Amino acid sequence: MDRAGDFLASIHIGLRDLIKPGLDLWEVEEYVRRRCKEENVLPLQIGVDGHMMDYPYATCCGINDEVAHAFPRHYKLKEGDLLKVDMVLSEPLDKSVLDVSKLDFNNVALMKKHTVDYTGGLADSCWAYAVGTVSQEVKDLMDVTRECLYIGIEQAQVGNRIGDIGAAIQEYAESRGYGVVRDLVGHGVGPTMHEEPMVPHFGRAGRGLRLKEGMVLTIEPMINTGTWEIDTDMKTGWAHKTIDGGLSCQYEHQFVITKDGPRILTSQGEEGTY
């Protein structure tokens, strides 16, 4: 999974220069698609089963009060927006097995045949981006959410329990006046993108499955300025928003638990083993 994680991290690094006021949000989706075709990588979110429709895009792009799974679309980013970009990508593939450049990413049914049954190396990561100059409220939310991510990862030690992760995140976020989304959680990874165990970002220490060496997990706290409660877009069954219109932020890393501590697989260069 290292190759997949390195490639996904390079995408997020590239987005740092792309995302700015006036950018059409759809260009984020186009950038990810282009990079995937150049490096022969499958965007694994295309074709994921949904309650009302299969997910049709390579990215999830949430703005301000959007919590998760929002569709990329034509929207001009504004000064002060808070953007979250989430994606799941394969490792670079051998073209003799599959030539990704020849796939039609807009044909969801066709893509589903390649993505849903994929069982190779993959990586899952979401990152938040400040669009231009943002308010202190946005800065503080981003800081606390990022801190929640690393506080949770630090708890992913051999012998600890799943509940230790969520309890640490919840205690930190709520002590600073923020809400922790309950409906959407982290998860195990491999050989498919969503595996047991589920990893809540809230809970009680000392509870849940005991963590073992070799487990690959994601931690992806969604932290809100107001209540933790969210609504779902019933037209698509995918996008979520805060019910009170408050801001929501998310950061996500995928990592493997080693005897020496968690090793981040989607590191953008500033992280390592705790």
Model segments located where?
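Active-site neighborhoods and metal-handling regions in enzymes and metal-associated proteins
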Residues: M1-Y274
